[in-house]
């Protein structure tokens, strides 16, 4: 009798173990192999840099237009009011905005006039990013009206929420510094800050004006701790080679246009050049930086 009981117990335990193994996660069901998480990936450190090693430097501001094909991985998947996740991927604004709400990244306000991280955004300001707001509005309870109450008696105060439409972020502005490190004999660049640019709309008509305004600034070295664990789509269409946003910025795998350089008058390119001339001026600045490094060597 004892042998039969032990045999039944062993059989039951084996069946329970098999059932536990049969329970698959959603991620495992959508792939032929188990994907390792990026949460433990560590940021690649910059090479040590001393002031005495920098023989030349220049600050550059550039904008990444997410409507360009090469920059689509920054924009998709689109947002429907909540952060959309497709195969562990989120858009760049979803990654940054979620980290700001959690307190993992510090957001700096007064973004239109200040890109030097002087003013941290308060919690109230963070809740209002991109026009998001909560307010009490009067609404009519039509069920009460159907029961015979007047519209005035059926009026109620309800909480109305307007979410931050992250799909309107169509550009990102980068502040970076190019420098020549004589210790390593290389021209190098490091991103200092980044800001999402939201499409401007006319307050009366609600129509797009064609302009863009920065919502906030983020200190890039701090954001790297979040970006290193945020997976991004590989445009080579090789899902086995998984990349993160930090990889994309580190390898400069994006298209952009220079909009400003450090100068005595501190002007943007579009303040003294217009249209095609502004694009040519951006190319001139880019070529000037290239020639600066090229002219240091003899061939």
Regions found by a protein language model. Name each.
Residues 167-169, 189-191, 213-215:
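Extracytoplasmic
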Residues 181, 186, 191-210:
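Extended serine/threonine-enriched, polar tracts that run as long, contiguous segments within proteins
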Residues 21-182, 201, 220-299:
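A domain-level signal for the mature, folded cores of soluble proteins
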Residues 15, 103, 190-193:
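Glycine-centered flexibility motif
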Residues 205-222:
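Short linear, low-complexity motifs centered on an aromatic residue
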């Amino acid at each position: 009798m004892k042998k039969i009981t032990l045999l039944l117990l062993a059989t039951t335990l084996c069946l329970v173990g098999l059932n536990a193994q049969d329970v698959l996660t959603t991620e495992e069901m959508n792939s032929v192999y188990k994907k390792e998480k990026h949460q433990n990936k560590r940021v690649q450190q910059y090479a040590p840099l001393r002031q005495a090693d920098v023989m030349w430097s220049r600050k550059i501001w550039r904008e990444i237009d997410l409507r360009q094909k090469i920059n689509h991985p920054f924009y998709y998947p689109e947002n429907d009011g909540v952060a959309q996740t497709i195969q562990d991927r989120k858009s760049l604004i979803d990654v940054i905005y979620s980290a700001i709400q959690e307190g993992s990244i510090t957001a700096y306000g007064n973004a239109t006039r200040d890109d030097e991280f002087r003013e941290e955004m308060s919690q109230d300001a963070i809740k209002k990013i991109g026009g998001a707001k909560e307010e009490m509005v009067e609404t009519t309870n039509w069920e009460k009206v159907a029961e015979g109450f007047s519209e005035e008696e059926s009026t109620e105060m309800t909480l109305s929420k307007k979410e931050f439409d992250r799909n309107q972020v169509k550009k990102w502005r980068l502040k970076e510094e190019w420098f020549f490190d004589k210790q390593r004999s290389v021209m190098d660049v490091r991103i200092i800050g980044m800001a999402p640019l939201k499409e401007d709309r006319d307050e009366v008509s609600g129509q797009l004006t064609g302009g863009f305004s920065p919502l906030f600034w983020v200190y890039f070295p701090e954001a790297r701790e979040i970006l290193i664990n945020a997976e991004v789509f590989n445009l080579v269409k090789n899902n086995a080679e998984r990349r993160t946003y930090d990889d994309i910025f580190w390898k400069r795998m994006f298209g952009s246009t220079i909009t400003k350089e450090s100068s005595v008058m501190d002007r943007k390119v579009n303040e003294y050049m217009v249209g095609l001339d502004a694009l040519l001026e951006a190319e001139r600045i880019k070529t000037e930086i290239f020639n600066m490094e090229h002219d240091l060597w003899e061939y």
